[in-house]
Swiss-Prot record:
Protein name per Swiss-Prot or TrEMBL: Phosphatidylserine decarboxylase proenzyme, mitochondrial
GO biological process, one term: phosphatidylethanolamine biosynthetic process
Sequence similarity: Belongs to the phosphatidylserine decarboxylase family. PSD-B subfamily. Eukaryotic type I sub-subfamily.
Quaternary structure and partners: Heterodimer of a large membrane-associated beta subunit and a small pyruvoyl-containing alpha subunit.
Function comment: Catalyzes the formation of phosphatidylethanolamine (PtdEtn) from phosphatidylserine (PtdSer). Plays a central role in phospholipid metabolism and in the interorganelle trafficking of phosphatidylserine. May be involved in lipid droplet biogenesis at the endoplasmic reticulum membrane.
Pathway assigned in UniProt: Phospholipid metabolism; phosphatidylethanolamine biosynthesis
Amino acid sequence: MAASVCRPYVRSLPGVMPWRSSSCHYEYTAMHHFLGSFQKLPFEPFNTGARKIHTAPVRSLFLLRPVPILLATGGGYAGYRQYEKYRDQKLEKLGLEIPPKLASHWEVALYKSVPTRLLSRAWGRLNQVELPYWLRRPVYSLYIWTFGVNMTEAAVEDLHHYRNLSEFFRRKLKPQARPVCGLHSVISPSDGKILTFGQVKNCEVEQVKGVTYSLESFLGPRTYTEDLSFPPASSRDSFRNQLVTREGNELYHCVIYLAPGDYHCFHSPTDWTVSHRRHFPGSLMSVNPGMARWIKELFCHNERVVLSGDWKHGFFSLTAVGATNVGSIRIYFDQDLHTNSPRYSKGSYNDLSFVTHANKEGIPMRKGEHLGEFNLGSTIVLIFEAPKDFNFRLKAGQKIRFGEALGSL
């Protein structure tokens, strides 16, 4: 019965052999050719009368469509950001502190895996390439327009004078452009933006509001106290107490961020004596305020140069922190310092004492004296000891210029 029903349909298929007498063999041969025809012929739409239903390969169902996925991802992220904004507004109305949104360990590790040291070295080499005379003005003008550089303050305003980007970044200022305040004991060592300032509490320094880093991790262990004019504290004292050498004093800090358009040199913030230099090879992550709010202990991860010594009120230190494309930190009186060098490995530090048999005090620095320079914008961190009545004359987030007062007694 099955053979008689299928015979009219199967005979019409091309390539089907004549039927044999055996019904079993007949059914097998017909069905074999019936199925084999689908491998030879392209798929045709089945006509169902009013409409056609087209078949498609199964693999096309699994093809990723980037535009809808990107739109869905972007919409989800935008919605999440709106939720965070709404939540922060609610917390602000209730008078509650908004918790900082810190990067996770894997996010920090992923960022540190980017070869920023190698990229910064390549950027440094590029900065040394001499530009053709006709190209200098358009290149420097674009940089001036992008970062808001005030060239009227430069000692040389002619853009053709600067042979390469490095010379332009390290341009000198006119003497009258940055008058040094003589009334206050501590001045700003550079142009920039005040991120944080205040007392150091519980051996933690404020990176930005709500985000801190370890004082000991930042400065390193006190293994060089024999070079300074005061003895080390006992081991049972906290690290902070080891730095505070006089009774009744407190430890203070101030963080200044230098943007790419700022004056890149830094100066002595007070009259003091530099006794020791410690160089920490490290990462070169961005140190802009947004990253400082996102990555905890950012300054401890990055390459930095710590200059420490003492001033009239006790311990004083200035730390130059490197950043992306700012692997070059130069200290004018330290010819042995070579930052972002492949011979140094992360996680170590290199010490140099300026106290010798011939010079038992170190290197004296006068307030406002040239101290060093960055290749591009970065960060300066001051940590110093002062009496309890020391007052900062600052506001968080304010712009400041070299020579202006930071605080006074």
